[in-house]
Amino acid sequence: MEGAKLSAVRIAVREAPYRQFLGRREPSVVQFPPWSDGKSLIVDQNEFHFDHAFPATISQDEMYQALILPLVDKLLEGFQCTALAYGQTGTGKSYSMGMTPPGEILPEHLGILPRALGDIFERVTARQENNKDAIQVYASFIEIYNEKPFDLLGSTPHMPMVAARCQRCTCLPLHSQADLHHILELGTRNRRVRPTNMNSNSSRSHAIVTIHVKSKTHHSRMNIVDLAGSEGVRRTGHEGVARQEGVNINLGLLSINKVVMSMAAGHTVIPYRDSVLTTVLQASLTAQSYLTFLACISPHQCDLSETLSTLRFGTSAKKLRLNPMQVARQKQSLAARTTHVFRQALCTSTAIKSNAANHNSIVVPKSKYSTTKPLSAVLHRTRSELGMTPKAKKRARELLELEETTLELSSIHIQDSSLSLLGFHSDSDKDRHLMPPPTGQEPRQASSQNSTLMGIVEETEPKESSKVQQSMVAPTVPTTVRCQLFNTTISPISLRASSSQRELSGIQPMEETVVASPQQPCLRRSVRLASSMRSQNYGAIPKVMNLRRSTRLAGIREHATSVVVKNETDAIPHLRSTVQKKRTRNVKPAPKAWMANNTKCFLDLLNNGNVKQLQEIPGIGPKSAFSLALHRSRLGCFENLFQVKSLPIWSGNKWERFCQINCLDT
């Protein structure tokens, strides 16, 4: 099969032979019609179409040549490849994938893994002889048991790993089939196996053997995935821990189905994180890889529901439309996907404005050539160099250097600027023709305030008419000059105009007014705050304007403390009188008066309280309270304790105990 015509997603179905332990021979539920050409089958009067449909009589070599051999060529070209075996237990998934060590079976029964590795070695050897490029082949073995990944080739195969770090598992080099035999023997020895009602040697975990092909240009992978059985938990007959194994197995298979259906539907968010199995296979279950599904089905009537479920999964996976891409091309495309924010052109460029002068009213830079290219395109190209080829980067840098050389600055004389402000454009044009070319002197930079106003001051030097055309820029004087246009102080820029300029303008200069500006030292904010705090009156609440919240709270607390201390000091002389008053108030009453008061309160409670209030009296329960309320309604009220004692509700010495509890006279 030609590589250009190879489909990115291929689905194949393989019928398993009859299981001998069932002890009966029945017609198969799978039928291969003669018109199918090996690509369709009929199950339960439903026809299913796939890329390949293998009957039970097909050999391992024929299945490998038609299904897996094209993936070997794509692997060496730098593509990611994955082959999955899906189906219920006992249908030959591990047998087809070749998870059994090669030395323990006959050569005609070798599965996909040893055959693929043999072809990889042949092609790697041929390429190294021609190109002399070092190509290394590695292999890793991962088991996913109870939603926990285990590195079967590591030093601690029974310690679970973190799912996100499964790409860093142990990889052993492969140089021959003997190395693969050692890896499979080591991994199979540590893999979990448990007998079920459907298979005496059923795998209770998902196994992933990854072949890594590394070179200077790419690092490609081929994943050989042997999924656990997809049968229901009830059919296994397991309970407890074994039942939980089946639940976790079906969880991983369900996540595989969800990922495949999401990719087929074109969803932007793929649920890779729903299980550990899809998390480990995330790098291979993408739109840039080759996927091959081998659906293993059973010919027995008792397995019809599982067979239909497997075929439906293959039908949904057939809807995938992938666009495989080599690893090197993937990196280039990712580098080209620069965020739009980084592709925006800069407003200024440090390289361009490094030799430019500040823009002010005195000096305005002007380019020598007016036909220069716009800088936005150059800056745009330079800013997005991350996604450009080396030639494009070189061209962008050359354009940037060209712009730097063409952007030469020419200073405009102050005579032009002053006259343009006054409106004498024609005279300024005449003077410009009489002026000699610029002397190349660096223009003086203005003050940091970059003022646009012109200060006109008195001329202090003698008039010289012979120097009208001479370029002159007045130095900065350390005085404050009054502007003629506005009665405000401006930046300290003074200009010395020539006599010809004064004659042309007709404006006589003002008398120079020098305003002495006293320079007061600027104090720190902490010093100013401290001085303001010291100037405040002692004992008064300080002003809370422009102070920190902590300072204001501290001042309020200090003032409150002083007030409290003063009040306590004033209250000390009256302390003895207060104690004497308290002593007179707390004098205990006489026992007889207290007893009479207690009896009165008790009778008031009996005469006025309801049933709930009577229940709160110590020694009276719900029945006694109800009886007291009933007798009170009969008598009207209780006048003394003798009437209460004569009631028939007190049996034995209950009245004496009641009186002791409530401090009453018996």
From Swiss-Prot:
ATP binds at G87, Q88, T89, G90, T91, G92, K93, S94. GO terms for biological process: distributive segregation; establishment of meiotic spindle orientation; female meiotic nuclear division; meiotic chromosome segregation; microtubule-based movement; positive regulation of microtubule polymerization; spindle assembly involved in female meiosis I. Pfam families: Kinesin (PF00225). Gene3D superfamilies: AF1531-like domain, Kinesin motor domain. The keyword Acetylation does not apply. In adult female, found in meiotically active ovaries. InterPro entries: Kinesin-like_fam, Kinesin_motor_CS, Kinesin_motor_dom, Kinesin_motor_dom_sf, P-loop_NTPase, RuvA_2-like. Residues 639-666 form a coiled coil. The keyword ATP-binding applies. It is found in: Cytoplasm, Cytoskeleton. Residues 8-320 form the Kinesin motor domain. GO terms for molecular function: ATP binding; ATP hydrolysis activity; microtubule binding; microtubule motor activity; microtubule plus-end binding. Residues 423-450 are annotated as: Disordered. It comes from the Eukaryota. Required for the distributive chromosome segregation of non-exchange chromosomes during meiosis. May be a microtubule motor required to hold distributively 'paired' chromosomes at the metaphase plate until anaphase. Belongs to the TRAFAC class myosin-kinesin ATPase superfamily. Kinesin family. This is Kinesin-like protein Nod. It comes from Drosophila melanogaster (Fruit fly). The lineage of its organism: Eukaryota, Metazoa, Ecdysozoa, Arthropoda, Hexapoda.
